[in-house]
A protein has these predicted regions:
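A charged, aromatic-enriched C-terminal amphipathic alpha-helix characteristic of glycosyltransferases
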Residues: 315-357
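Conserved catalytic-core segment of nucleotide-activated headgroup transferases in glycan assembly
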Residues: 67, 167-170, 182-240
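Conserved acidic donor-binding segment of nucleotide-sugar-dependent glycosyltransferases
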Residues: 293-304, 312-318
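Extended catalytic core of nucleotide-activated donor transferases of GT-like folds
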Residues: 51-54, 63-154, 163
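Short alpha-helical segment that forms part of, or immediately flanks, the ligand-binding pocket
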Residues: 247, 270-274, 285-289
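A short hydrophobic beta-strand element within the catalytic core of glycosyltransferases
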Residues: 256-257
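Short hydrophobic beta-strand element within catalytic cores of glycosyltransferases
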Residues: 278-281
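Aromatic "clamp/platform" in nucleotide-sugar-dependent glycosyltransferases that forms part
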Residues: 261
């Protein structure tokens, strides 16, 4: 029997049987054939430039990432920028032209992306594409009772730590997963020849207690510390060090100090551990599952004990190097860039396939 669109259900079954999924969510002029959820082709991901470091590591995967750019370079519309050495798979799209482009899925990275940006620049048919939302942060309003702004169970929620997933109220959705950080192995290794600690936090004073400004301000009275990051010059810091130069810069310091009370596990911490640097941190959020006290760093909620430990690291470079070697082993195992991009590509593909299988079910 010859199948044609006029055969209705039989024609649809024939398409499914042959592994072809037809995207009905788009108007005829924008329709695209997907073979098994496009499992065989190179994916086209649309997202915004929100966190440069995260986007850089995400771009190490085997897919293409499209990001919008506008004339004012407003939040999320910076394009590639000049800070990170993005490869050719990070592609700028004029914000006004986004609605005319073909993508396999949409990745939200902030409340603004989800509540405002998508409605400003995406066509209606694009807003029905497979969608994911990566939540980079811990809950802000309340540590346990904050309902996430993204409440659509059809959108895949991705948390960057298990602590974040535990604390956010995701509305009971089962469409939630965790993809832990991944960073590249740096070309430099830990030296530790500067007998001081290094702190890497943007706008630490302006962000207050969350980023531990008061903790840092107290500790630096007792321990030699340097501070770098955007907006730190007025807080006694050295200013910003661009990400490509960061591993070389921090590798000379004896240890990395993270005074942050309540945020996600920092990429700067992952990068420091990957160089073989010991990390000193508060025993909060995801840090307690990664840093083992006096094995690969120092971790505690007692600031006096941390001060004592940091001064011991200053006095004993051999001990600092031993802790740093263990930190590198942990980082290599836990924060592999290969595992990270594989997790993301699998999540993209599974989300796309699930979307089209559901949308093209012969039983609907």
């Amino acid at each position: 029997m010859r199948f044609s669109p006029s055969n209705g259900l039989m024609y649809k079954r024939a398409l499914v049987a042959n592994g072809i999924v037809f995207d009905k969510a788009r108007p005829v002029s924008h329709q695209r054939l997907h073979m098994n959820g496009n499992n065989s082709g190179r994916l086209r991901i649309f997202t915004w430039h929100i966190h440069g470091s995260y986007l850089y590591y995400l771009s190490k995967g085997n897919y293409d990432i499209f990001i919008p750019v506008n004339g004012t370079r407003s939040e999320g519309y910076y394009g590639r920028g000049e800070t990170f050495p993005f490869g050719p798979n990070v592609i700028e799209v004029d914000a006004a032209d986004v609605r005319n482009k073909e993508f396999d899925c949409i990745l939200f990275q902030s409340e603004r992306n989800y509540l405002i940006d998508q409605h400003d620049i995406l066509a209606d048919w694009q807003k029905r594409l497979p969608r994911l939302y990566v939540e980079h942060n811990t809950p802000v309003q309340h540590p346990t009772n904050s309902r996430h702004v993204m409440t659509d169970p059809a959108v895949k929620m991705v948390h960057v730590t298990h602590f974040n997933k535990l604390m956010w109220d995701n509305g009971g959705s089962r469409n939630v997963c965790v993809i832990e950080h991944g960073v590249c192995i740096p070309e430099v290794s830990y030296r530790g020849d500067i007998p001081r600690g290094i702190v890497v936090i943007n706008h630490i004073e302006q962000r207050g207690r969350i980023t531990g400004w008061d903790v840092f301000d107290e500790v630096r009275k007792h321990v030699p510390l340097d501070l770098i990051g955007m907006g730190t010059s007025g807080s006694g810091g050295l200013g910003e060090v661009l990400n490509p130069q960061l591993p070389e810069f921090i590798s000379h310091y004896r240890f990395f100090f993270n005074p942050i009370r309540y945020t996600s596990f920092g990429l700067a911490v992952c990068e420091a551990m990957m160089t073989g640097m010991p990390v000193v941190a508060l025993a909060t959020t995801e840090y307690v599952t990664v840093i083992k006290d006096r094995e690969c760093g120092l971790i505690d909620t007692n600031i006096d004990r941390l001060i004592e430990g940091m001064n011991n690291l200053i006095a004993d470079p051999v001990w600092a190097r031993q802790l740093g070697e263990q930190a590198r082993e942990v980082a290599t195992s836990k924060f592999s860039i290969t595992r990270f991009v594989t997790d993301w590509e699998n999540t993209f593909r599974q989300t796309i396939q699930h979307n089209y299988e559901k949308g093209n079910s012969i039983y609907q």
